Structure formats: structure tokens, C-alpha cells
């Protein structure tokens, strides 16, 4: 699971680290260096994320992996494939750098045969990811890259769905309170939790009679 900044901010800012880790089955939260930088830098301009930065500093080390964005042959190749520019030029475009490096690292690992899930809320980032999923499958069909590798994506609502399924929220009221806090942070989530389908059964268990 490789994360963009937005979804991570929502869980950090609302003290939902246990729910985040439960949602991904105890896997490691992987972030590119550019995302780690954004977690530390964005709160300087957007104070609603200051608490997220503090929580990230205390994030359990065994569940966190900040991966270097230093140039590699595969990252360079992926950058040229996805964006049509060299890596050094991409580095100079600070806007969306975290999101872009998330995609490049994910694609690089998928080419190496790993099963990768990218966590992103930005619609532009999702569109780019969908396009690269199609390209990867086409290359696998042609036999030009390992067939065992895969690339997929999930959004904050997907993570919340998974967290509900594994019983990570104490109650539906607890979930709704946290959701409303997340929705106030930015524009990525619907303001009304009812619009997400996340208060239905499933993902909540059936009512006992």
C-alpha cells in the first residue's frame, strides 16, 4: 500500500491510526519521500493538518516505510513512460509531486512483480493510475513484463469501508463522528456520510434480533 498525502492526512488528523492499520490488514504504510515532505510542510500553510504532522512523527515505526525518491533506472523509465519528461524535470514540479512519486513507485514495483495498491483521493491522480493499470495489463498480455505484478487503487472511502468490515470502529456513532471530522478537512469526501453508503449494512454487520 503506497499512500498519497491526502488520505493519510485524514486518518492522522482525526487520530484514526488504529483504523488505518486495521484497514490494510496490518501491512506497512509506504510513502515516497515527497509525501513525507508534504506531511511536514503542508501544515505550515494549512493549519488543520498540524495535528496530522504531530501524529505522523509518533507513527509506529514498524508500520511505516518512507521510500527514497532518488533516481533509479526503473523510476526514470517509469517517469518517461507516464509523464513524458525526465525525473529531474518532474522533481522541479512541486505541485502534486507526492502523488506523482506514489504512482511511479507503484508502477516500478508492479513491473518487478509486486501486487501494489495506491491510496489516492485526487481525481487527477486516480485517472493517471487507471491509465497505467491499462498500460500494465496490455504489456503483460504482450509478455513484456511479469504477469504476477499488479496495480490497483483505493480511496479514503475504501479504507473506511475495510476498517468497518474488520470492526475497527467501536460503533457506528464513533465512525460517523470521525467521518465528519475527516470531511471537514478538505473537499475530497462527501460532506454527508449517508452519500457514501458507509452507514449501510454491509459494511456494518447485520442487526441482531
Model regions and ranges:
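Active-site-proximal, substrate-binding regions of enzyme catalytic domains
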Residues: 1-116, 123-209
Amino acid at each position: 500500500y503506497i499512500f498519497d498525502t491526502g488520505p493519510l492526512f485524514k486518518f492522522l488528523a482525526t487520530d484514526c491510526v488504529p483504523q488505518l492499520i486495521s484497514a490494510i490488514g496490518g501491512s506497512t504504510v509506504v510513502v515516497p519521500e515527497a509525501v513525507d515532505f508534504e506531511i511536514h510542510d503542508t501544515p505550515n500553510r494549512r493549519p488543520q493538518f498540524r495535528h496530522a504532522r504531530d501524529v505522523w512523527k509518533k507513527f509506529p515505526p514498524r508500520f511505516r516505510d518512507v521510500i527514497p525518491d532518488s533516481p533509479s533506472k526503473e523510476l526514470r523509465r517509469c517517469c518517461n513512460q507516464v509523464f513524458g519528461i525526465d525525473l529531474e524535470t518532474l522533481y522541479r514540479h512541486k505541485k502534486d509531486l507526492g502523488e506523482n512519486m506514489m504512482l511511479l513507485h507503484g508502477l516500478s514495483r508492479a513491473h518487478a512483480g509486486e501486487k501494489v495498491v495506491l491510496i489516492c483521493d485526487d481525481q487527477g491522480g486516480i485517472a493517471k493510475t487507471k491509465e497505467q493499470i491499462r498500460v500494465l495489463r496490455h504489456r503483460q498480455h504482450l509478455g513484456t513484463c511479469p504477469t504476477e505484478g499488479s496495480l490497483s487503487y483505493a480511496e479514503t472511502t475504501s479504507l473506511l469501508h475495510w476498517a468497518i468490515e474488520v470492526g475497527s470502529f467501536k460503533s457506528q456513532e464513533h465512525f460517523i463522528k470521525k467521518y465528519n471530522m475527516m470531511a471537514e478537512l478538505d473537499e475530497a469526501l462527501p460532506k454527508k456520510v449517508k452519500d457514501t453508503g458507509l452507514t449501510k449494512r454491509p459494511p456494518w454487520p447485520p442487526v441482531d434480533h
